[in-house]
Regions:
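Non-catalytic terminal accessory segments
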Residues: 1-135
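Alpha-helical transmembrane signal-anchor/signal-peptide segments
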Residues: 137-147
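Soluble catalytic domains of enzymes that build or remodel membrane lipids, polysaccharides, and related
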Residues: 145-378
Length: 378
């Protein structure tokens, strides 16, 4: 492993240890009737669980088999639950301080046990709800008006499905469900702006095989996300191309008068590389004597001033998952602002950010719904 990935792993593991320690210390302080033996067992369990997701992730990058898939799923589910236990622990500590120092209760210590029981029970219910909610994919219809839209595109329908994260958790059956839902919408074209794969080891051809059943008459177009570029993107790009999907790796195509472009995530993550990639496409458009590109597949809703300056009318993005679960729904909003999800304007550029169909990490959605987007060109 190179130095930067190792450092990132160590930082993530340190955060997980800190979070588990806070949950553990709060639980033993507030949960009634714990024996010394139970506390010791809990301490060992929390150490193992704190290590579980990083270990499972490393295994999933090297091996692909049912045992690793089960380990990864269990670790990811626990990651979701401990997230809610951590939030619950913060609430318990704050509520206890309020009860203790408000002097409104004669015996505040009597509330310690019931307080923990109620809050941790809510955390468990939130996790269960998240598991169920993540499997219910909504169809979101979005009317789109593009000033330079060719007349031939008016009234056409495009399906946008991002962030499927095909891998140990979202397998081939999940892909079939997404394809079936998309097919029912009878799209003229399909856009996939990244993270079709989770980036883990697996039978890539098998995972994307259901996509062969999608047959929009104007094609399917894909640009890479960060999960296709964790290692070498070539294996993922090749698997996607083999099912008949056009991969736009800093490339553009003209489809019935509409120019569609895609930028690789690595290049979009740098302003200089992003500008160079779009300038190259703009130069090719000028040399051919045709109009500027109209639609850009850009995995993350970033570099908007550069995209607008390059003359695009519509950017299609994913990446954010809308935050996926609380409190990351709030954190993501702080990072991406209004472009966290939905359709918004940046100057002359329209930007649609999808919350995605799949999940990463915890297979849960709380405070945010998974979606397939139907774009209706007006």
């Amino acid at each position: 492993l190179k130095a930067r990935p190792v450092l990132a792993i160590l930082v993530v593991q340190a955060i997980l240890f800190l979070g588990h320690w806070f949950v553990y210390s709060t639980f033993i302080a507030f949960w009634p009737g714990l024996t010394p033996a139970a506390v010791a067992d809990l301490r060992v369990a929390m150490i193992v669980l704190a290590l579980s997701f990083v270990i499972a992730s490393l295994l999933s990058f090297r091996f692909s088999n049912p045992v690793v898939s089960v380990i990864y799923w269990a670790a990811a589910v626990w990651l979701g639950f401990v997230n809610f236990f951590l939030s619950g622990s913060v609430v318990i500590r704050l509520a206890w301080l309020a009860i203790r120092f408000s002097h409104l209760v004669a015996n505040p210590h009597a509330f310690r046990g019931p307080l923990a029981e109620v809050i941790y029970s809510i955390a468990v219910l939130a996790g269960i709800y998240g598991l169920v909610n993540a499997r219910i994919i909504r169809i979101r219809r979005v009317p789109v008006q593009i000033p330079n839209l060719p007349a031939s595109w008016r009234g056409r329908r495009a399906v946008m499905m991002s962030d499927l994260h095909l891998g140990p958790i979202n397998g081939v059956q999940f892909c079939r469900r997404v394809v079936a839902a998309a097919s029912q919408l009878k799209p003229d074209v399909v856009f996939i702006p990244g993270d079709l794969f989770d980036g883990t080891k697996g039978d890539l051809d098998h995972l994307v095989a259901p996509l062969r059943e999608l047959s929009p008459r104007l094609g399917i177009y894909f640009s890479t996300g960060n999960h296709e570029e964790f290692t070498s993107p070539k294996q993922y790009i090749d698997a996607i191309a083999r099912v008949g999907i056009r991969v736009l790796a800093n490339e553009q195509v003209v489809v019935d008068g509409l120019r569609i472009a895609g930028v690789m995530y690595h290049d979009s993550s740098s302003p200089l590389r992003m500008k160079a990639a779009l300038d190259k496409m703009r130069s090719a458009s000028s040399e051919s004597g045709v109009a500027q590109p109209d639609i850009l597949l850009n995995h993350a809703p970033t570099r908007l001033p550069i995209v607008e300056h390059a003359g695009f009318s519509l950017q299609l993005s994913g990446h954010t998952h809308g935050g996926q679960i609380f409190p990351f729904t709030w954190i993501t909003r702080r990072v991406y602002g209004r472009f966290t999800r939905g359709l918004h304007r940046f100057g002359s550029l329209e930007v649609y950010t999808s919350t995605g169909a799949g999940t990463w990490g915890p297979p849960m959605r709380v405070g945010m719904q998974p979606e397939i987007v139907l774009l209706e060109f007006e």
